[in-house]
Amino acid sequence: MVTNISMADFYEKYQHENLDLIDVREVHEFQAGHAPGAKNLPLSTLEQGYKELNPNRTYHIICQGGVRSASACQFLSAQGLTVTNVEGGMNAWPGDVE
């Protein structure tokens, strides 16, 4: 099952909790600026790359605008992972980027 979280709610949690954030944008997009602490796992490599993820963790998934992350969440959920889609993606990110 996929859940969604608004950027406002996510950012509040992000500031106070140690969340697992996966950015599914392509490498060049990630390198141009990403949320501090995010791990890059591009959607194009997700079918193999997801195997690195711990099935006992909850992951928040982000992209640029929310479309790719929603697709990634559907796939990851089908693999048995617990995931939450961050709505609005980096377009809505209010904080600093690395």
List where the protein language model places each region:
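Short, surface-exposed ligand- or partner-binding patches at beta-edge/loop junctions that are enriched
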Residues: 62
